């Protein structure tokens, strides 16, 4: 999927780029709900590859098609729910559409109208590749009722419209959590199969190799690591902290200190040269940084290390 070339911050933006009607979609709220059969009237339909920067829930009562996410292709059939989150390349294909509800929302909407720390209660929103899940008839009936209420509020003009929608989204997320994600453990996924975590760790490792070899002398920021994966910086930060138990800043700091300690054990390297190799413009800044994390200055660490060898 590496050749996909559409990047979309919202569903409205995606539909515009795909040449589809956006009449039923609001542009600014960060939330949408609509029935796909109203948009896709000429079937079969296959989208171009795209990378969305929003969450999607697809509730399929009567339809058939396929959904490709990165290198995995899933069959989508009736009475299923399909969830995707920001970041992965994907393609959707529809052969039959009679009753299918798509709900999308951005992280900003979640944090403003659901909860500012939404991932603490709904950590499954950070799961990266989730195959379609089959609902029992009772489960689907409950979800369908919530979809109907969300659609009604979305099309209405209530004074507290987005707050009402936010409350209904909480109910929907709780149902999905109850049905499928009671045992979801982000740390376990982070250790085992998180592609976002793996890519971040590889990027971190490669960057420090470039620093130490002299290929670059500029430290990357958290924003730079997010840009490498075409993710919003807040989303990447949430994924890394939830799935590793450490913030991105902590990962960077730990790597800085590890590499600094290794170089301080080489008497041929001056502290000024070590600071420069790690991207610090001034040696005092590096010394203060090292002492903050190690409670000892670089010179003190070096002396302590060589004393321990004698």
Describe the residue ranges of each PLM region.
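Generic protein-terminus/edge-of-domain signal
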Residues: 1-65, 72-74
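Short beta-strand His + acidic residue motifs that chelate non-heme Fe in jelly-roll/DSBH
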Residues: 67-68, 84, 90-95
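Short acidic-glycine-tyrosine-enriched beta hairpin
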Residues: 71-83
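Short hydrophobic/aromatic patch on the recognition helix
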Residues: 79, 236, 285-286, 290
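Short, Lys/Arg-enriched, Trp-marked, Pro/Gly-tolerant hinge/linker segments that flank
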Residues: 158-163, 178-224, 242-247
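Terminal helix-turn-helix DNA-binding modules in bacterial transcription factors
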Residues: 242-283, 303-310
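…primarily DNA-binding HTH/wHTH and HhH modules…
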Residues: 287-310
